[in-house]
Amino acid sequence: MKPIFSRGPSLQIRLILAVLVALGIIIADSRLGTFSQIRTYMDTAVSPFYFVSNAPRELLDGVSQTLASRDQLELENRALRQELLLKNSELLMLGQYKQENARLRELLGSPLRQDEQKMVTQVISTVNDPYSDQVVIDKGSVNGVYEGQPVISDKGVVGQVVAVAKLTSRVLLICDATHALPIQVLRNDIRVIAAGNGCTDDLQLEHLPANTDIRVGDVLVTSGLGGRFPEGYPVAVVSSVKLDTQRAYTVIQARPTAGLQRLRYLLLLWGADRNGANPMTPEEVHRVANERLMQMMPQVLPSPDAMGPKLPEPATGIAQPTPQQPATGNAATAPAAPTQPAANRSPQRATPPQSGAQPPARAPGGQ
């Protein structure tokens, strides 16, 4: 009986033929690139199916990321706010550090004598006593601080140490009612005592004669008398001059230059009291004060005319005008000009009349 379907090649032959065809196609594609264009067409035709099959996955990822990113954004926002706050606080501290650096530079730049030593200290507290004006500093006996030690700032005299502990000390301010300080007027070298009147008021110069030559704006410096404070440091500037007609006295007030209500950094001085037995002359104090004022408080310095003549140089001032006498032709008037400074100073120490309007007219009589 003849079968309906004829038998074809065996499976093994088919497999061998398929393998040979596949190898031929692979070799032809690798050598000649015959099917590269066909693959490109096939990838282009199949690519929409890739997007369609990947769309659900991208949708689910987007939804989950949206839900999770809100909390993450809130955390990041909170962290950024905290970081911004810290940066702003650091900027504020940077400004404060710059101010402190400038103050310390001014403080360390205060001119001193060669035999004077200094140490920077900081005010850590103020004494809450309505009857005493004191501050507490962060230096004590371990740092060599002693009672009576002078204390200054970058603008002038502050006070003196009155109590010393191991790590801290108390400083009595010059504005305290129990404090008195020997001073000298820079313009004419008059020496007086400046007494404290409370830090809310100015220093007071009491019981001065009515004709005392002290004016508003005069700079008062330490005279060095008593050996406690160094010579030539600025203390105050005269703020008011009032005449007491009943007692023929002049009441003078002077505003401290150190800014006693805004103290932060101070200088402790050593060696200022070594020459207490031999204080400087008024002329030397005048010279030292001018040198220190040029660095410490140039904005308060009066004009050179208001300071008066330079006292250490009277001899050179007299010798210089003599060559000009032949040009003027008047030898009698030449020596009169150099004697004017001495005449201006002599009435200040002489006993003047009681009337405040007559001293200028009697100045020649004081000669």
From Swiss-Prot:
Periplasmic side: 36-367
Superkingdom field: Bacteria
Gene Ontology BP term (one): peptidoglycan biosynthetic process
Gene3D superfamilies: Rod shape-determining protein MreC, domain 1 (2.40.10.340), Rod shape-determining protein MreC, domain 2 (2.40.10.350)
Locations listed in the record: Cell inner membrane
Assigned keywords, A-Z: Cell inner membrane, Cell membrane, Cell shape, Coiled coil, Membrane, Transmembrane, Transmembrane helix
Compositionally biased intervals (Polar residues): 345-357
Cytoplasmic side: 1-12
InterPro entries: Cell/Rod_1, Cell/Rod_MreC_2, MreC, MreC_beta-barrel_core
Function: Involved in formation and maintenance of cell shape. Responsible for formation of rod shape. May also contribute to regulation of formation of penicillin-binding proteins.
Assembly description: Self-associates. Interacts with MreB and MreD.
Name of the protein this chain belongs to: Cell shape-determining protein MreC
Species: Escherichia coli (strain K12)
Top-level taxonomy: Bacteria, Pseudomonadati, Pseudomonadota, Gammaproteobacteria, Enterobacterales
Encoding gene (name): mreC
